Amino acid sequence: MGISDQINSNLSSQSPFTVSTNPSDSMFLPTNRIAKTADWKEEKKYYYPKESIQSIYEGTTVRIVIDKQNGRLYGLEMVVEIGPLTANGATFTRLCRDVAHSMAYSVSIWNGNNEIHRLHMDHERIEMVLTKLKHERDMEDKMAGYYDDATRTALGATKQKLIFDLNFFHTVHTSDALYLNAWH
């Protein structure tokens, strides 16, 4: 069973989503940053309307996109609030590297313009990453030494929203592997 099939199976055992084919009902409309392949076309997508969006963690929302041709889960877009972040993503890079090292994986993170670090993971690692991010966010005020003074001075307690675009790339080289990209 492929990764996407496993996730589809897991989803079917949870509360059912209300499926809509109307893009205007979607919390997130398609953008170039998630159009990773030529197959990402309007007529090939289902959209899950706002009322069916489920939170897996507080501060985290998920949109699920399904390829209508074969019904396979095509990608996830997650919005996660953590912070503070430096203007160039240096603090976030450090966090991602910590995650990568703890998982013995490499990290692929984008700051909107440049790839900061690379993370190759399968869907079983997604929860581990999100748990780590949520922990760092929740523990932020208790970890005075984690963020440098310049970061705190520049951004204070401002929360930054990160877009996590977990896309499937069904190719010979990557198979059902997931790549995690983040923007801020």
Curated annotation (Swiss-Prot):
Superkingdom of this entry's organism? Eukaryota
Positions of region (Disordered): 1-24
Entry protein name: Putative uncharacterized protein DDB_G0277465
Q: Which organism is it from?
A: Dictyostelium discoideum
Q: What is the lineage of its organism?
A: Eukaryota, Amoebozoa, Evosea, Eumycetozoa, Dictyostelia
